[in-house]
Amino acid sequence: MVLAMSGSAAGPPPTAMARFVGVPLAPLATAPGEPPFATLYVSATVAVTATEAGSSHVATRLWMHGDPAELGPLYTAPVPHGVEVGRLDAMPEGHAIPAGISNGWTPVELDGYVPANAVVDSLDRVWKLAELNYETTCNDCHMPHEPNEYSPMQWGMIMPRMARFAKLLPNEEMSILKWLQNTSATSDTRR
C-alpha cells in the first residue's frame, strides 16, 4: 500500500532501521522506472526494505495538513514542530485516502522506490557540506545567522529570498534550508 492511515509519529516503521534521504530531492515511485508520485527531500527518515536494480524500496511515516486527496507538502510532524520533508504530487490509483485526524493533520505511510544512491545511513556529511556552504555563501553579504535564531517555518520563508540574492542552485538551496530547519528544530532556543 502506498498511502495508508498511520497511527504514529513520522519516521520508518518501528521494526526497520532508520536511514535518511541524503540528496536534495529524491523521486518516490510505485516501482523502479515508474513516474514518481511524490518527492522526498534531504533529511526525510526512511526504512529500506529492499534494494533492486539501482532502486531502494523504502517506507516512511509522515504528516499532511488538510485533505490528502488535495496532495501537497509532507511534514515530519504537525507544524509548528514539523519540518517539510517532501511533497505528495499524485495519488497512486487504487490506494486508500486516510481520514483526517486532530486539528486537520493526517498521518500517512508512504511506500515506494527511490534511487539507491539517494539513501544514506547518516546525515553528518550532508549537514557538514550544507553548513559550510551556508557559512561561505552567506558570509559574502552578511554575518550568517545561527540556525536557532529562527524557527523551521521562519527559515522556510527567509531562505528562498536569500537564495535568490546568493544565486544558489536549487539543490544547494534545498540542502542548506533543510540543514537550517533541522538544526533549528532540534535546538532549545527559539525567537
Predicted regions and their residues:
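Mixed-charge (acidic/basic) macromolecular-recognition segments
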Residues: 122-127, 146
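The canonical Cys-X-X-Cys-His
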Residues: 134-144, 176
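Short, flexible, mixed-charge glycine/proline-rich loop motifs
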Residues: 128-132
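SH3-family beta-barrel domains
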Residues: 4-35, 39-41, 49-54, 73-123
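C-terminal capping alpha-helices of c-type cytochrome domains
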Residues: 166-191
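Gly/Gly-Pro-rich "capping" loops immediately C-terminal to redox-active cysteine motifs
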Residues: 143-166
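Basic/aromatic-rich interaction segments and small domains that mediate binding to polyanionic partners
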Residues: 59-69
